[in-house]
Amino acid sequence: MTQSQGQDPRLDTSRTIRAPHGTTLRAKSWLTEAPLRMLMNNLDPDVAEHPHALVVYGGIGRAARNWACFDKIVEVLERLEDDQTLLVQSGKPVGVFPTHKNAPRVLIANSNLVPHWANWEHFNELDKQGLMMYGQMTAGSWIYIGSQGIVQGTYETFVAVAKKHFAGEAKGRWVLTGGLGGMGGAQPLAATMAGFSMIAVECDESRIDYRLRTGYVDKKATTLDEALAIVKESDTPVSVGLLGNAADVFAELVERNITPDIVTDQTSAHDPLNGYLPQGWSMAYAAEMRQQDESAVVKAAKQSMAVQVKAMLALQTRGAATLDYGNNIRQMALEEGVENAFDFPGFVPAYIRPLFCEGIGPFRWAALSGDPEDIYKTDQKVKELIPDNPHLHNWLDMARERIQFQGLPARICWVGLKDRERLGQAFNEMVKNGELKAPIVIGRDHLDSGSVASPNRETEGMMDGSDAVSDWPLLNALLNTAGGATWVSLHHGGGVGMGFSQHSGMVICCDGTEDASARIARVLHNDPATGVMRHADAGYDIAKQCAAQQGLDLPMLNEELSKLK
């Protein structure tokens, strides 16, 4: 570390990490080269929010606990054999054990706490002592692909909002939101893709500038009047990054009787200490206060969140389609006395759950070669294999035209149980026959149909009341391990913060081998099938129909399913 960084082992401004490209391996096989490259890709300065501090996205979502741990993980992956498995505990490599060639090469557990102690206060104490790391969802599981990772899900949500509230017509309408970080930064592009204009309030000017450079936001404004004028005067959908405090701007719109068509938020409200700037505070003052009085920061942040949520509720009563986009801001406001904070819905029960019932979710893949042509070829293969889905084809065309790759070229594409395995097998065959220059890794967000328990987000309002049952993501992780995913992760607190979620992830490497084909057959079937199982078990008819069509064996439901075939 450089001298100026003092004692913080997580900060090193001298380091610049980029994933290797091409076909020369640093590790002993592609099965260990894959996690090595994707770990490094998470910390590429074109990908990560604060790479020098190992922060990938989502407040303090890290890829490794500290730089010594990062270096040791790299060292181990370079020497790991194909019958060994590396264990990673909250970003720290803690053991290498003998397994077998079809076992995962890496097993990861991040941020998990015994429920009674599963809160930010206890986590932050452990974090300060170097005993824990916040892994968010795809930060600590090494499958973050930049803002593209959530663009399609956000796009699908905005399209669904247009259908539900505006008869499918987005023209001339605009969205108000907050936050342009790693997740929130996807919102402006998703909105304009769906035909809406957007004003996105962000307190960190560097984030607005970054989204401008990468094409995720169109314009920058420093006053609300300027932002409103840009939206009003544009004949086509336009996105504006507005420098300001979300609570201030949302409240000002209420006071001025200006009502957006859609209102949402993607600030890092899940982490009141590190993720939300209190009203009246500068970025520098907030950083100083985090060192001096953490409780004061948390209190001030949550008070400001309450102001913002009250404004969102007021805009809802005036006709705005208002939705929570999964950052737990409603819960924070509720704890500050806003008793009706949950009067506006979360985006999953309102718009996404029917997709989850069919195992449809954020399937993603990355080209380990580093060559964009590998992604373009896989885009075409998806179109060939799913020829009768013009909506999906339109997404792929828009993605190629409008989304800049960050780090290793990658693609996000929402597909479900009936398609994931087929696509994985096709990609593996393309590697085998040389159509692609190097292997592909396939993963997903932890925000998926069967891999998360999050009562204020993905599992909000389950029809059987099982919102908080977290057996499901644990079973998902166990099954993906048994099936032979290349690496598997089990996390706590992603998206909505400590105490509010448990979730699992998997990544599988398509290296062109027959062994990979067998693993793909298991993993890319079983993984989405757990989502169909979970929703069928909760009573959703769409999930039961999908389970019957796909021949799932669900012992307590098989008699009912047999009548649906």
Curated annotation (Swiss-Prot):
The keyword Lyase applies. Its EC number is 4.2.1.49. SUPFAM superfamilies: Urocanase. The keyword Disulfide bond does not apply. The active site is at residue 413. Catalyzes the conversion of urocanate to 4-imidazolone-5-propionate. This is Urocanate hydratase.
